[in-house]
Amino acid sequence: MPKLKDLSRSLITLEQDATLIAVIDMGYSSWLVAGIVPGIERQPLKKLGVDESALLKLLYRWREEAEKAGHKIKRIAVAFEAGRDGFWLARWLNAHDIETHVIHASSVAVSREHRRAKTDRLYTELLKRCFLGWLRGERDHCKMVAIPTIKDEDAKRPNREHESLVGEQSRIINRMKATMARVGIRGFNAKLKKAAERLDGLRTPEGEPIPPNTLAELRRDMVRRRLISDQIKQIEDARLGRLTQAPSDGPHTMVRLLARVVETADMLVQEILSRSMRDRRAVARYAGLTGSPDESGKKRREKGLARSGNARVRRGMIQLAWRFLIFQKDSALAQWFRARTENARGARKTMIVALARKLLIALWRLVREGVVREGVVPDGVVLRPAQ
């Protein structure tokens, strides 16, 4: 496992007189760069086009201004908020020896006023305050996001595209069912291979064939569904091909190990289990399977699921937990769930989250150990044969 970093605060001593600090508010068509330059009383603010080379020149120019003011710059620290642009700029700046950090968007505290002023200039000031506190090593100013390599980002694409295509296929099928229901036809399975050939023989309750415009719409939907189905199969075949070609390569080993326990192994490995997690609490927190306490004075209540982490992992684990109760009913975890919900049916939704959290932590421990042995796999869980 790679060495873990504390992303909640900086562990490097901040020499403010020798550190050039900059934050970037990244827009679709322009970037607003705000800086703290040692020796310069004004705090510069510069609007740039979406141009990384111009950004680098600006940072070098500010460094020259600081050196002219008698401050030798030893460190340039840059930060921007995680968002649509991803991590390419952070990787590019790091490659040019610029220390770059990506701020977790939801960790930045904002004013609770009902109508607060919000402009790019004000937001860069807010980011500067957060980043400066983080650089000083103070906690709770903001949190940073681990910057993945381009290979790690690319490894997530097949699963995410597969999820998107499956959702699109479901939407097309549901739309076809709704179209047929409008003319009184029910029970038609649009997923059958010969479904398109059967359309001409369908009749409405009045004994009439499907109207021509509706029939044409259904045929176009079937073409779209067939195309999406082929693309889903291509993704699944490519995934099996990668596992076959490099069975002992890092994440692929994890996938083959987890495949003995769960069918969502590839998604879990790429989204969470290949990441460096400090402990089981960090694993549960990343998946958003933790609670949201609301405590003040004598009030003690729970607001429910935090939902602050990776939604794909959270959704997949809760689905897996329900299936686990069906297919691993003799396991210790399934018995634990039944013992706590047997006389409290209203607690099932709460306890399924707890079961999902326990399962995720058990899978994380299994991947960390790298072998299937007693004490790692939960008691009573039946494994598939190794492949």
PLM-predicted stretches and their roles:
Residues 1-387:
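A detector of single, family-specific signature residues
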